[in-house]
């Protein structure tokens, strides 16, 4: 029986971006199952780019190989922006690669024009997009009627879409490589603390862009439960993030009676809106 052919379209899996890392973890997992014929479609690379040939699955880019067409794209700002998301080669990719499943992982505007393609939904089409703010972008809402398999990265976006009548929208969080996260033996941790002259405090650190999908209230609620259940650990929560967007972190901390002090991070960034919160 033939394996299902899956075309996964996003940033190149070796790029150090959120989409790139997510795609790498997804492709690596699916490849290990041996159940699928995988094809990677990468934005920002030419169709036959040599850089895409060093993975265990097939890889193609979304920019044309022809230098003359590349020049035409370069002088047309709108065309160049759309080309960065794959519009130049997506029809060719579907025709030549003949996927059973198309999975697009990008911001919702990356799929501009895709929903009206003759192949859309004739191939099993899945969109996994980041909706980072409320209210939900109008283009993301209008797209819901044309996307049969619509996945978002954050549950707040799923809830908002369902309030608008789009009950088929579901949440799938970004994929982690769990082999990268593990607890060191107590002896090793003790040696590291001694070597770096660290106090025996329990510090939970989070470096992030302050967006609604980051679930900051859940983190603070969890930390408070942990702190109250383990008062002898001298636990601290270190948040390195932005003040001027997303969650009102200072307000949340005050509501939870967690904040004792906070420090302006003037050393790590020139932005006056960047703060380190040390909660204890």
Q: Where is each model-derived feature located?
A:
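A short helix/loop element that forms part of the nucleotide-sugar donor recognition site in Leloir-type
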Residues: 182-198
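N-terminal subdomain of nucleotide-sugar transferases
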Residues: 1-48, 53, 97
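Conserved donor-binding/catalytic core segment of Leloir-type glycosyltransferases
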Residues: 8, 198-214, 220-223, 238
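Extended catalytic core of nucleotide-activated donor transferases of GT-like folds
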Residues: 50-149, 155-159
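Carbohydrate-associated surface elements
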Residues: 44, 156, 175
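Short donor-sugar binding/catalytic loops of nucleotide-sugar-dependent glycosyltransferases
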Residues: 12-14, 207-212, 243-244
């Amino acid at each position: 029986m033939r394996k299902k052919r899956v075309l996964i379209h996003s940033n190149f899996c070796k790029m150090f971006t959120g989409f790139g890392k997510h795609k790498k973890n997804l492709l690596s997992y699916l490849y290990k199952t041996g159940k699928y014929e995988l094809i990677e479609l990468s934005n920002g690379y030419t169709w036959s780019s040599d850089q895409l040939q060093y993975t265990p699955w097939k890889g193609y880019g979304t920019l044309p190989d022809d230098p003359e067409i590349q020049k035409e794209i370069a002088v047309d700002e709108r065309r160049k922006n759309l080309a960065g998301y794959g519009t130049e080669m997506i029809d060719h990719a579907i025709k030549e690669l003949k996927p059973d499943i198309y999975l697009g992982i990008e911001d919702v505007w990356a799929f501009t024009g895709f929903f009206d393609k003759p192949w859309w939904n004739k191939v099993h089409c899945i969109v996994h997009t980041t909706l980072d703010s409320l209210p939900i972008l109008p283009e993301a809402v209008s797209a819901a009627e044309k996307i049969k398999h619509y996945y978002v990265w954050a549950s707040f976006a799923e809830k908002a879409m369902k309030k608008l009548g789009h009950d088929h929208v579901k949440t799938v969080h970004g994929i982690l490589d769990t082999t990268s996260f593990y607890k060191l033996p107590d002896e090793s941790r003790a040696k590291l603390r001694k070597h770096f002259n660290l106090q025996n405090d329990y510090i939970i650190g989070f470096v992030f862009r302050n967006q609604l999908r980051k679930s900051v209230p859940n983190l603070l609620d969890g930390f408070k439960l942990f702190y109250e259940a383990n008062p002898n650990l001298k636990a601290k929560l270190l948040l390195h993030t932005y003040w001027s967007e997303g969650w009102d972190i200072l307000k949340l901390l005050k509501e939870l009676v967690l904040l004792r002090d906070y420090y302006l991070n003037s050393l790590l960034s020139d932005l006056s809106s960047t703060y380190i919160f040390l909660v204890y």
